[in-house]
Each structure stands twice: as C-alpha cells, then as structure tokens.
Amino acid sequence: MIRIRFGMDVLLVLLLATCLLSPTHGTPLEWDFAVTLRTKIQFMDSSWQTIATAAHEFDELSALTFDESEELIYFNDLKHRNGSIFSLKRDLIAANHVVEQTIARTGNESVAGLAYDPLTTNLFWSDTEQRKIFFASIHGSATPKVLVDLSAEGGRPDGVAVDVCRRKLYWTNSNVTHPTVERIDLDGSNRTVIVNSDIDMPRGIVVDQLSDRLFWIDDLKGVFFSVESSKLDGSDRQVVLKDKHHEPLNLAVTNDAIYWTDRTTRSVWSHPKVPVIRVTTTSKPEEEDSTDATDFKDPEPVAEDCPLVRVANLSEEARGIVARTGFYQRLQKDHHCASIVRKVKQRVDEQSRKFEVSSLLDQKMKVLENERCMNNGEYKAATDLCICPTGFKGSRCEIRECHNYCVHGTCQMSESAYPKCYCQPGFTGERCEVSVCAGLCLNGGHCRASKEENEAPTCECPAKFGGARCEQNSTEICSLFCRLLKHEPEMYVPFGCHSICEELAQGNSTNIAVPQYQHLEVCLTPTVWTSSVIIILVVGIVSSLLLVAVIVHGIRRLYKPKRPRIRKTFVVRKQARTNSAGDTPLTNRPLATEQCEITIENCCNMNICETPCFDPKLVEQTLSKSSCKEDKKILIHNMEDDLY
C-alpha cells in the first residue's frame, strides 16, 4: 500500500508539473492590456491580439483597475443587484478566472473611476451620482468611507488615480461650469487644485510613475478632444495631442505610448508620449530666368506629425482600460518608490506564507514551482506569478531584455529597469539602429563619422559642391551671379565663380557675363618666397646662432675651475746637519751655522721645488713687502748664484 501510495503521489506531481511548466493559452495571465466592454473584459497582448475574455455574466461594466502585486483585476458593474465592485483572478487549478464580490452595493452608485493602493489594499472610486470619492479595504465588509465630498460645491468627480509612491490621490472634476484637476493625500489632508484654467471637461486620468507626470483626457467643446500632461504638481503643462471626432473616456500609459478608449468608434487608439523628431530639407524650385538670390541654410529638426493609430477594433462600446507597467521590476531602484515596493513585496510574501504546507507532496510541488521561474525569479504561489529580477521578463523570467536589443551598441539596464543602448561611434537611435550618415550628405558627398561621441559627422563634397551637407551647388550659384552680372556690371561676384562663368559664357554669351578682376594674375599664382622674406629668414637664423654661441661661452666661463692658490711653508733648523764620512768639499756644500728649508707647493707647474735659503731674514722681509711673482724671481735667482 505504501508503494502504491508513493507511486500515485509521484504521478500526481508529474501531472501538476506538466500543467505548471507547460505554456497556458487563453488565460488572462499573459495579457498586456485589459479593456472593459459593456458585457465583458477583453485581454490583449502587446500586439493587441485578443488572448482571452472574462466576466461574461455582467451586463453593464464601466471602470476597472489593476493590482499588479497580486495579479487582480477590480471592475464595476452598474446593474448588479448586490455588488458594486468585483475582483477577477486566475484559478491556478482550472486555468480559468474567478470573480468575487469586493464592495457591496449600498444604493444607486454610478462608478466612473477606480484606483487601487497596493500598500494599504484600499480601493478608491468616484461616484458621479453622489458627487463623492469613496474608499474601502478589500479585506472585510466595512462600510465605505468618504474621502472627498464635492456635492456642496457642485463638483462632479470622474477619473481617479493613486500615486502609490508619494501617497496621493488625483482626480478630475468634470463639472462644465468649473472643471479642475485636483489632488489630496491618501489620509484626506492637503487638498490642492493643480489645474483650473484652459480646461473644459476632464475625464480619465493616470499617474505615470516612470516619468513622474500626469496624463488626462479633456473632452473639449464641440467635436474636439485633447490629451494633456503636466508634472505631479500641475506645472510644465503640455498638450500631447489635440484632435476631433472622438468621445474618449479613460486612458492608460506605457513606457512610450498613450492609449485611450473611444465610445464613438468602439476602438482603442494610441499616440506616442514624445513626438518623433525627423530632419527635413525644403528646397525651392529654381526658375531659369530668376534674378533673386537664394540663401542656403542648414536644415533644422522638425517635429514629425504623429498620426493616431487605431490599435484595436472592438465589438462593443469601449470604456475602461489598464496596461501592465511592470510595477516590481521598473520601480525597484526609483528613489521615490523603492521603499514602497519593498513594503508591498513584504506584504505579499507574508500572505504567501499562509499557503505553505509541510507534506511530502507539497514539498515536491514547491520545488517544481520554484523551478518554474528562471534566472533567479521569485515564484508567488498565491498568484502563480514569477517576479523577475531586473533585466529579465516573461511569464517564467526566461527572456533577457538586453538580448538582441541594441543593433550597433552595448545594452545595459537603466535605473528605471529598462534596457538602454550605448551606441558605437557613427550610430544613434533608441536601439542604435540609425546611422548618423544616413541621408546626411547630398549630391554624392562622402560622409565621415567622427570617433568622438559629441562631434557631428562631416561631409566630403565632390567638385563644385559645398555646404555642411554638400547641398550647395557652386555651378548653380555662380550661374546666378553670372546672369545678374550681365544686368548689373558693378555687382560683386565671388572669385571662385570666374572659371565657371567662363565655361558658361562659351555656350551662352548673350545671358552670361564674365567678371573682370584687377590683378587677377596675383590671385591665380600667389608668390610666397619673395626676396624680403628670404632676407628676413636668413638674418633671423644668423642672429639665433650668435645668441646660442654667446650663451654657450658664458656657461663655460661660469663653470671653469679656478687656479689653485700657492702656499709657502718655511721650516728653520737651528742645528746644522753633521757631515757624513763620505762628504767632501767637492761633493757637498758648505754648512752654515743656521739652515732653513723652504717647501713651496703648487709652484713650478704643480711640482715641488726644494731650494736652500741662506738668508731667512731677507726672505721674511721680502715676503712682507713683495708679491708672489717677486718671490718667485728671488728664489730662482738664488738658485742660479754660485754659492761656493
């Protein structure tokens, strides 16, 4: 029995693993956009292909919002008898959706906008009938509380949006007599009007956490509408789009585009958040007999007209819309949102621990679930969702966002957790897919891209063309001067046009005049090496050589060693030396009663001269009176005397 039980457990584990690890189709998990129609919720992927539908049991859906932390959709039904707001989640076992009542109906509510705070798990909604904004927790059955009451002032709250990171609620007041865009802290304090001018009937509103900006729809008078944007405090207001023949209700924002629902065409439309910049050149056709000079200027960047794109045609009236923003991955490093993301993650982790069990089967299932998420992704059993680390995406974190993203460059993840390309020299664009030389040089010019990052590319123009992009045809310009010169002989003509005018005059001398320059031969053959230049150059070289010689001679005199100083030493012996036995008058000099020896150093060309001194007193007197030269003469003279 034990063996059979164990085999059944293993078989069950394998079957469940197959369900977990195999891709699921037709379920709301893989969606990127969700749209509420009148009787259903439609889920679509990034290419706006329908992958699933849900909530078919309802009759009058309106607003919706998305809790990305727990993969929950919250929506409203205007005609349900018991409930007002419901939640939709995916069933892990049946691979289907489950709808539960979240907020009970208390009267004739007319919900226009929904927003969710994942930190406090509170829902916020606007009621156009009661002219109030309510909030309530999704856990428990407490009576909803009023956050903002606009009934006394005649306001009409419409769209609502929660700034999760800065803990504020934004809403639009669509009262046509006094429309506004306002905000308030989530605790009900610090109510502020941020936009109250040049606005007609604001509808949907959304907070873009990636760019720290607000986006809202304004249903203008007549058939016009606009999409506007501002900073979170209402400053730096911009009109992103203005068009007509739409009846927009709600909008959603992604990293690069804005999407909104249109009740008139039953469609979803899109427009870029930032206009695309392109470079255009406008050329004016030149007439043959024109006499007006044309100024050639470098082209300037022009904002390209971004047309509206209908991304989805729907079978019913389109109302609410939400988009997946990557709350966990994109805001982990944002200095405003990092702490909030961490707290939300802790709350979800604590809730996930309630599902943990210790049986053998559950342990094996947990191993398989953890293996479902690749690249260190974190598996959430409560939502069957992989929370991917920065740089990875996909239902199993199997896709590296930088893989093949940059065409000619290096990809790195930015602080906003989006791939960013650092382009090689010569390429630009979001993915380094555009060459800086593409279409730059005209008329056969050759483009050279600089190796420096901030240096613009240059064009090497062929003969008779010039300008930054070789857009200036010197032949055409000079032909214009040559024609004008025929009618105005005193007009100035650039020197480079002389040869061109001569060529044109050979075939059409009646309409072309050749400019006559004074001293043309000087301009054509300039002589650089004149006699005066050569003389100045020679004098300069000779002066330089003399200066170098003087400097070298002075250095040698400065560092030449000094002559040694003559020193004299006198040694006097009072006792005469005794003659030896071999001394004779012929071999030895007569001995005096007193004898002195004089040792003179550094004289006689650095030799030591030893000479007898027969009159020390005379020498002493002489030393005190005579100079060194006289001493030398006396010594030499005494050596030559006959002493015998």
Curated annotation (Swiss-Prot):
What this protein is reported to do is described as:
Has a role in spermatogenesis and oogenesis.
Origin superkingdom: Eukaryota
Tell me the protein's name.
Protein cueball
The UniProt keywords, alphabetically, are: Cell membrane, Differentiation, Disulfide bond, EGF-like domain, Glycoprotein, Membrane, Oogenesis, Repeat, Signal, Spermatogenesis, Transmembrane, Transmembrane helix
Query: Per the UniProt entry, what species is this protein from, by scientific name?
Result: Drosophila yakuba (Fruit fly)
The stretches annotated as LDL-receptor class B repeats are 121-166, 167-211, 212-257
The gene that this protein is the product of is cue
Q: Which residues form the EGF-like domain?
A: 398-430, 433-471
Cited InterPro entries? 6-blade_b-propeller_TolB-like, Cueball_EGF_LRP_Nidogen, EGF-like_Ca-bd_dom, EGF-like_dom, LDLR_classB_rpt
Kindly list every residue the record annotates as glycosylated. Answer: 82, 108, 175, 190, 313, 473, 508
